[in-house]
Regions:
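Anion-binding alpha/beta catalytic cores of soluble intermediary-metabolism enzymes, centered on
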Residues: 1-143
Length: 143
Protein backbone atom coordinates (compact mmCIF):
# COMPACT_ATOMS: atom_id res chain seq x y z
CA UNK A 1 0.00 0.00 0.00
CA UNK A 2 2.88 2.33 0.80
CA UNK A 3 4.46 1.71 -2.60
CA UNK A 4 1.16 2.39 -4.38
CA UNK A 5 0.82 5.67 -2.49
CA UNK A 6 4.44 6.63 -3.19
CA UNK A 7 4.05 5.88 -6.90
CA UNK A 8 0.58 7.48 -6.97
CA UNK A 9 -1.01 4.25 -8.22
CA UNK A 10 -4.76 3.85 -7.82
CA UNK A 11 -5.92 0.70 -6.07
CA UNK A 12 -9.60 1.52 -6.62
CA UNK A 13 -10.22 -1.52 -8.83
CA UNK A 14 -7.96 -3.83 -6.82
CA UNK A 15 -9.24 -6.23 -4.18
CA UNK A 16 -6.73 -6.62 -1.35
CA UNK A 17 -7.08 -9.94 0.46
CA UNK A 18 -5.75 -10.01 3.99
CA UNK A 19 -3.83 -13.25 4.44
CA UNK A 20 -2.01 -14.84 7.35
CA UNK A 21 1.58 -13.75 7.99
CA UNK A 22 2.64 -17.38 7.47
CA UNK A 23 3.79 -17.61 3.81
CA UNK A 24 2.58 -21.19 3.40
CA UNK A 25 -0.91 -20.33 4.67
CA UNK A 26 -0.96 -17.26 2.42
CA UNK A 27 0.02 -19.42 -0.56
CA UNK A 28 -2.66 -21.97 0.29
CA UNK A 29 -5.20 -19.13 0.29
CA UNK A 30 -3.94 -17.92 -3.11
CA UNK A 31 -4.07 -21.46 -4.56
CA UNK A 32 -7.65 -21.83 -3.30
CA UNK A 33 -8.56 -18.52 -4.95
CA UNK A 34 -7.11 -19.73 -8.27
CA UNK A 35 -9.12 -22.95 -8.00
CA UNK A 36 -12.27 -20.88 -7.34
CA UNK A 37 -11.58 -18.72 -10.41
CA UNK A 38 -10.99 -15.60 -8.31
CA UNK A 39 -7.35 -15.31 -9.48
CA UNK A 40 -5.88 -15.94 -12.92
CA UNK A 41 -2.17 -15.72 -12.04
CA UNK A 42 0.03 -16.43 -9.03
CA UNK A 43 2.94 -14.08 -8.42
CA UNK A 44 5.82 -15.29 -6.29
CA UNK A 45 7.07 -12.01 -4.86
CA UNK A 46 9.52 -12.47 -2.00
CA UNK A 47 8.35 -15.94 -0.99
CA UNK A 48 10.85 -18.76 -0.91
CA UNK A 49 10.24 -21.05 -3.87
CA UNK A 50 9.55 -24.08 -1.67
CA UNK A 51 6.90 -22.10 0.27
CA UNK A 52 5.14 -21.29 -2.99
CA UNK A 53 5.51 -24.65 -4.70
CA UNK A 54 4.43 -26.87 -1.79
CA UNK A 55 0.75 -25.82 -1.85
CA UNK A 56 0.75 -25.70 -5.67
CA UNK A 57 1.97 -29.29 -6.19
CA UNK A 58 -0.03 -30.73 -3.28
CA UNK A 59 -2.67 -33.22 -4.47
CA UNK A 60 -5.35 -30.65 -3.57
CA UNK A 61 -3.42 -27.80 -5.20
CA UNK A 62 -3.08 -26.82 -8.85
CA UNK A 63 -1.17 -29.86 -10.06
CA UNK A 64 -2.06 -31.15 -13.54
CA UNK A 65 -0.49 -33.68 -15.89
CA UNK A 66 1.65 -30.91 -17.43
CA UNK A 67 5.18 -30.03 -16.38
CA UNK A 68 5.36 -27.21 -13.86
CA UNK A 69 7.79 -24.45 -14.77
CA UNK A 70 8.65 -20.91 -13.80
CA UNK A 71 8.33 -17.73 -15.87
CA UNK A 72 9.90 -14.49 -14.70
CA UNK A 73 8.77 -11.34 -16.54
CA UNK A 74 10.53 -8.02 -16.17
CA UNK A 75 10.95 -4.59 -17.70
CA UNK A 76 14.15 -2.67 -18.23
CA UNK A 77 13.94 1.11 -18.03
CA UNK A 78 16.02 1.50 -21.19
CA UNK A 79 14.45 -1.25 -23.29
CA UNK A 80 11.10 -1.03 -25.06
CA UNK A 81 9.94 -4.63 -24.65
CA UNK A 82 8.95 -6.88 -21.78
CA UNK A 83 11.49 -9.66 -21.19
CA UNK A 84 10.99 -13.12 -19.74
CA UNK A 85 13.22 -15.84 -18.36
CA UNK A 86 12.14 -19.45 -17.96
CA UNK A 87 12.83 -21.79 -16.05
CA UNK A 88 15.46 -20.54 -13.64
CA UNK A 89 13.95 -22.00 -10.49
CA UNK A 90 11.78 -25.11 -10.73
CA UNK A 91 13.43 -27.59 -13.13
CA UNK A 92 17.05 -27.87 -12.06
CA UNK A 93 18.71 -29.93 -14.83
CA UNK A 94 16.22 -30.37 -17.70
CA UNK A 95 17.09 -32.36 -20.81
CA UNK A 96 16.19 -31.12 -24.30
CA UNK A 97 12.73 -32.75 -24.22
CA UNK A 98 11.90 -31.09 -20.92
CA UNK A 99 13.28 -27.76 -22.16
CA UNK A 100 10.78 -27.95 -25.05
CA UNK A 101 7.95 -28.49 -22.54
CA UNK A 102 9.16 -25.54 -20.47
CA UNK A 103 9.30 -23.36 -23.59
CA UNK A 104 5.78 -24.44 -24.58
CA UNK A 105 4.52 -23.57 -21.07
CA UNK A 106 6.09 -20.13 -21.28
CA UNK A 107 4.68 -19.39 -24.71
CA UNK A 108 1.21 -20.49 -23.55
CA UNK A 109 1.46 -18.29 -20.44
CA UNK A 110 2.59 -15.28 -22.47
CA UNK A 111 -0.28 -15.81 -24.91
CA UNK A 112 -2.76 -15.85 -22.00
CA UNK A 113 -1.28 -12.52 -20.92
CA UNK A 114 -1.94 -11.14 -24.41
CA UNK A 115 1.70 -11.28 -25.47
CA UNK A 116 1.91 -12.73 -28.98
CA UNK A 117 4.64 -12.73 -31.62
CA UNK A 118 7.14 -13.83 -29.01
CA UNK A 119 10.83 -14.02 -29.83
CA UNK A 120 12.80 -16.76 -28.08
CA UNK A 121 16.50 -17.13 -27.30
CA UNK A 122 17.91 -20.39 -26.00
CA UNK A 123 20.77 -19.23 -23.78
CA UNK A 124 23.92 -21.10 -22.80
CA UNK A 125 27.31 -20.04 -21.47
CA UNK A 126 28.65 -19.72 -25.01
CA UNK A 127 27.08 -18.98 -28.38
CA UNK A 128 28.79 -21.84 -30.24
CA UNK A 129 28.01 -25.54 -30.07
CA UNK A 130 30.44 -27.21 -27.68
CA UNK A 131 30.23 -31.02 -27.55
CA UNK A 132 31.32 -30.97 -23.90
CA UNK A 133 28.60 -28.48 -22.90
CA UNK A 134 25.16 -30.14 -22.86
CA UNK A 135 23.26 -26.84 -22.84
CA UNK A 136 24.70 -25.92 -26.25
CA UNK A 137 23.80 -29.34 -27.68
CA UNK A 138 20.26 -28.99 -26.31
CA UNK A 139 19.96 -25.48 -27.76
CA UNK A 140 20.91 -26.75 -31.22
CA UNK A 141 18.38 -29.58 -30.92
CA UNK A 142 15.57 -27.26 -29.78
CA UNK A 143 16.20 -24.62 -32.44
Amino acid sequence: LELAATEELSLDDIEIVDTPKDPILATKKAVEMVKQGKLAVLMKGSLHTEDLMGPIVHRDGLRTDKRISHLFLFELARYHKLLGVTDAVVNIAPDAKLKREILANSLAALKKLGINNTKVAIIAATEVINPTMQSTIDAKEIV
